[in-house]
Swiss-Prot record:
Region (Disordered): 1-222
Residues annotated as binding AMP 3: H383, T432, A437, S458, A459, H530, S546, L547, S548, D549
Involvement in disease: Wolff-Parkinson-White syndrome: A supernormal conduction disorder characterized by the presence of one or several accessory atrioventricular connections, which can lead to episodes of sporadic tachycardia. Cardiomyopathy, familial hypertrophic, 6: A hereditary heart disorder characterized by ventricular hypertrophy, which is usually asymmetric and often involves the interventricular septum. The symptoms include dyspnea, syncope, collapse, palpitations, and chest pain. They can be readily provoked by exercise. The disorder has inter- and intrafamilial variability ranging from benign to malignant forms with high risk of cardiac failure and sudden cardiac death.
Binding site for ATP 2: R302, R384, K402, S474, K475, F476, D477, R501, H530, R531
Annotated residues for binding of AMP 1: M317, L318, T319, I320, T321, D322, V362, H383, R384
Gene Ontology BP terms: ATP biosynthetic process; cellular response to glucose starvation; cellular response to nutrient levels; fatty acid biosynthetic process; glycogen metabolic process; intracellular signal transduction; positive regulation of gluconeogenesis; regulation of carbon utilization
Cellular component annotations (GO), alphabetically ordered: cytoplasm; cytosol; extracellular space; nucleoplasm; nucleotide-activated protein kinase complex; nucleus
Residues covered by the CBS domain: 275-335, 357-415, 430-492, 504-562
Residue numbers carrying Phosphothreonine: T165
Modified residues (Phosphoserine): S65, S71, S73, S90, S138, S143, S161, S162, S196
Protein name: 5'-AMP-activated protein kinase subunit gamma-2
Biased amino acid composition, Basic and acidic residues: 179-189
Length: 569
């Protein structure tokens, strides 16, 4: 009976549409429609909403706001065929990434085409697909050690500079994501810590060089697309002045395989080679010469920049060559004390030695390329090139042939190997093979110093009576005279002077003219020496190959660099 009464009430409500029951029923209908609209949309688009948070978990929130606040996939939904409620955040939110994404500067290259899949996608993965510097460690702005010493070079090398440059847009698609599988193991991170950009090894994937679709670019750093425009903007007239004095025999060398090492050096700055932590000793010109050389020995360094307080600038370098020149000029006999070494100040010695022919200190900016550094070292016939910040005036590091070649050798296995690396020394003609200066084991030290000064060389092979190379006496060995305070007696023999290193000396590092250049480079870098003695089958001296000879062959000779008639300032 209860059921009959219920049916009667239902009929009464239906038969009287103008009554209160009719109004209540209409409101119920309207409410039911509101409830079921989001359910239909969720079933109609299961891939969009169902894969995000679950189809039944937030159905009440989907009624009022179809887009979850802060969802990274709002930009994708706005492109769907379904009519969506307009929202001020539905269209322009694509560049906004999740908090863990390192890139926010390339919205333009991804608004051209919508993603193929409507599923949730990570923005970091999207940006990584067309930018080689997408890893968190490759962004200088997020790297903890990115601006430790010289923030200016880090800013100019980052992607955040001029993202709208047309050159960058055309080069974004040159390097696909697949090139990352050839990424080297970043040995520089272990050796140089954060001193070099984390993306340096990624530029030299073999697939990048061999890609037939690589567009020709005017910049010598065309194989590094993500930093080409930044490097071009960073090189000002002061840094690029040296390269303007170079001529190239053939412009095609820029794209040839033989110029791969030259392009490597052009794409890296001097700051990239500066270690995270190193020792740099600076001398004031009012310091006594004797104390300065003792300080070199105590700190284990071979050279130091000279600071003049009157000019408030660096005016030169004090090296072991200065020590040799002082001994060569003022040594008389073991009975006469070298007064000039004991009492002279550095500024006094410079005035006497240079005799008013003062030349400005040859230095280089941390923003200059390593190609500039190699050219400056070889052209000026110097062995040490101070890196000085032009803004603060601080000395950051001292570049050498040895350091530059070691940096280059770290990446050689990841670059295409030029054909000349498989040629031997005889075919390439690298080294010095005529008028070789040498000494004997019983040669006095003072005579060896005279040869250093007159021939302007840095090492002398020691040859016995049979002509066999048994040792080598270099300029660096002369500083041991200051360490042992035996510089007042230069009549001792070379053998006696070299006894201090007999315990750890492993012998002369040698080679022959039939060995290929690749073997020579590997041997001189591993041995950490400045030269190799070229010998024949009888172990007799044939020639000398130095670090400058190797850098000339690897970098400058393939570039066809010529010095113009004008002098470099």
């Amino acid at each position: 009976m209860g059921s009959a009464v219920m049916d009667t009430k239902k009929k009464k409500d239906v038969s009287s549409p103008g009554g209160s029951g009719g109004k209540k029923n209409a409101s119920q209908k309207r409410r039911s429609l509101r409830v079921h609209i989001p359910d239909l949309s969720s079933f109609a688009m299961p891939l969009l909403d169902g894969d995000l948070e679950g189809s039944g978990k937030h159905s009440s929130r989907k009624v009022d706001s179809p887009f979850g606040p802060g969802s990274p996939s709002k930009g994708f939904f706005s492109r769907g065929p379904q009519p969506r409620p307009s929202s001020p955040m539905s269209a322009p939110v694509r560049p906004k990434t999740s908090p863990g994404s390192p890139k926010t500067v390339f919205p333009f290259s991804y608004q051209e085409s919508p993603p193929r899949s409507p599923r949730r996608m990570s923005f970091s993965g999207i940006f990584r697909s067309s930018s080689k510097e997408s890893s968190p460690n490759s962004n200088p702005a997020t790297s903890p050690g990115g601006i430790r010493f010289f923030s200016r070079s880090r800013k100019t090398s980052g992607l955040s500079s001029s993202p709208s440059t047309p050159t960058q847009v055309t080069k974004q698609h040159t390097f696909p994501l697949e090139s990352y599988k050839h990424e080297p193991e970043r040995l520089e991170n272990r050796i140089y810590a954060s001193s070099s950009p984390p993306d340096t090894g990624q530029r030299f994937c073999p697939s990048s060089f061999q890609s037939p679709t690589r567009p020709p670019l005017a910049s010598p750093t065309h194989y590094a697309p993500s930093k080409a425009a930044a490097l071009a903007a960073a090189l000002g007239p002061a840094e690029a002045g040296m390269l303007e004095k170079l001529e190239f025999e053939d412009e095609a060398v820029e794209d040839s395989e033989s110029g791969v090492y030259m392009r490597f050096m052009r794409s890296h700055k001097c700051y990239d080679i500066v270690p995270t932590s190193s020792k740099l000793v600076v001398f004031d010109t009012t310091l006594q010469v004797k104390k300065a050389f003792f300080a070199l020995v105590a700190n284990g360094v071979r050279a130091a920049p000279l600071w003049e307080s009157k000019k408030q600038s660096f005016v030169g370098m004090l090296t072991i060559t200065d020590f040799i020149n002082i001994l060569h000029r003022y040594y008389k006999s073991p009975m006469v004390q070298i007064y000039e070494l004991e009492e002279h100040k550095i500024e006094t010695w410079r005035e006497l030695y240079l005799q008013e022919t003062f030349k400005p200190l040859v230095n280089i900016s941390p923003d200059a390329s390593l190609f500039d550094a190699v050219y400056s070292l070889i052209k000026n016939k110097i062995h040490r090139l101070p890196v000085i910040d032009p803004i603060s005036g601080n000395a950051l590091y001292i570049l050498t042939h040895k350091r530059i070649l070691k940096f280059l050798q770290l990446f050689m296995s990841d670059m295409p190997k030029p054909a000349f690396m498989k040629q031997n020394l005889d075919e390439l003609g690298i080294g010095t093979y005529h008028n070789i200066a040498f000494i004997h084991p019983d040669t006095p030290i003072i005579k060896a110093l005279n040869i250093f000064v007159e021939r302007r060389i840095s090492a002398l092979p020691v040859v016995d009576e049979s002509g066999k190379v048994v040792d080598i006496y270099s300029k660096f060995d002369v500083i041991n005279l200051a360490a042992e305070k035996t510089y007042n007696n230069l009549d001792i023999t070379v053998t006696q002077a070299l006894q201090h290193r007999s315990q750890y000396f492993e012998g002369v590092v040698k080679c022959n003219k039939l060995e290929i250049l690749e073997t020579i480079v590997d041997r001189i870098v591993r041995a950490e020496v400045h030269r190799l003695v070229v010998v024949n089958e009888a172990d007799s001296i044939v020639g000398i190959i130095s670090l400058s000879d190797i850098l000339q062959a690897l970098i400058l000779t393939p570039a066809g660099a010529k010095q113009k008639e004008t002098e470099t300032e």
